[in-house]
Amino acid sequence: MNLLALTHPDLVFINPPHRTPEALIRWLAEPLAGRNIISDEETFIQSVLQRESEGPTALGEALAVPHGKSEAVQQAAFCLALFDDPIRWPGLDGDEEVRMVFLLAIPPAEAGSTHMQLLTTLTSLLTEDRVRERLLAARTREEAMSALSAEEPQKQDAPPDRSLLIPVILGSIATAAFLQAGLSWACAVG
């Protein structure tokens, strides 16, 4: 899945002013409405807050992926907020420190396809240390977009990174838990 097809530099924010989940979700919904990705900002916000109340969306690795499926969503897309200083976000074992927040907007018709593909692509990509480090080091929207493209090849002379095993395992666990939560939510809504 091409992540860049689902976002835009105008939907990427470095150190946004809001540091609580609800305030950040509300703030990130505004540019989605401005780009006509969502037709009704408040309906979309309520769908995200409802999903947040059903289960945590912090997935470890400094990542949170709040999301909403609503008739107000005109096309699948996401906003990205990056923080130098971590914010607190509800996780499976209490609040987690988060530095990357991907707010997903999913049309109901794509709840089982695009939604799951996007979650899997994001969590898989962000288990790669190189990608996560580039994203967290981004100082501009363009640098963040470049990190998401994952086009920068690794140096040929670099030895293989054996430290990837733990992030891959954690990413797989987080993906499985997130998919299970998403499927149970989709079944409950459907």
Explain the meaning of each model-derived region.
Residues 1-190:
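Cytosolic covalent-transfer regions centered on His/Cys nucleophiles
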